[in-house]
Amino acid sequence: MTYSCPCPENNESEILYQAHHNSHEIKVNVECTSHSNENIKHWKPTLLKCKKCKLIFSSLVNIDFEDSYINVIDETYISQIPFKTKTLKLLFKKIRQHLNKNSEVLEIGSYYGVLGNIIKPHVKIYTGLELSKHAAKYSIERYNLNVIVQSLDKFLKNGYKYDVIIMTDVIEHLDDPFNILKLIEKSLKSNGVLILSTFNIASVIPRIMKRKYYWLIPMHKYYFSNSTLKYFLYKYNLHLFKVKTDTRLISIKYLLNKFIVFAPKLAFAFNYLLNFNFVNNLTVRVNLLDLNIYFS
């Protein structure tokens, strides 16, 4: 059986990792913080690799998740906002030099407004774009942010141009990232900057873990490497000029819940640790060099 790459050239692709279950068994949870005690096999779709452009993508790439995002209510994320704020402040420090009081900024996938709330005081105009009605409402009411609920494709055709467009942990979810990159380029001012973050599938950790890599889940459709992302950015006149690693501050409670999913045989130990209240206030700094921030 042959597979076509979803890139514009539709090159022939081959199976990189074969799923060990039927496609109808896959359970897709599009919440940012999705985790549960489901069998981990449900989190591992078949991965394919283009023979020409080397793009790695999921067998679920043709499934439209947009309607699911609209109805997302992510209570786990809300409970983790104090920790998410610490992480996104680290991100802000790394992108700060590209923002100023005259900047008009668009954040694609603004979710519950944590990054927008950090950015807003430092720029002229901040606009968030979000599919989740619940997340957008929360952002508006809690942080008084300008957040629009609209499809990305439709919004980027309005002709407005920005100094900076930010897209953190979003590109891997998009139905058609190639068309979106094309529209983003047209939505940037002449000296505008696109800042996006995603995981680098060619980095050491995913190479070692292979199909057990923790970010290999159904809600992620595309798995870019530094080289494939650079290739597609260049294709749409978005020239990559800088890459920084992305450090995360994660609560121990959230991390233990993740471990329960990925190592169910040790769930008893992780659940025991969760019984201690002090665990809820602890954080750990994580940088395994597989998450990057790209500037173009």
Where in this protein do the model-derived segments appear?
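Basic phosphate/pyrophosphate-binding loop/patch that engages nucleotide-derived ligands
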Residues: 186
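S-adenosyl-L-methionine-dependent methyltransferase catalytic module, highlighting the catalytic core
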Residues: 41, 167, 175-183, 193-296
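Conserved N-terminal segment of class I S-adenosyl-L-methionine
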Residues: 1-168, 178-181, 245-246, 278-295
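Surface-exposed loop/turn positions
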Residues: 103, 191-193
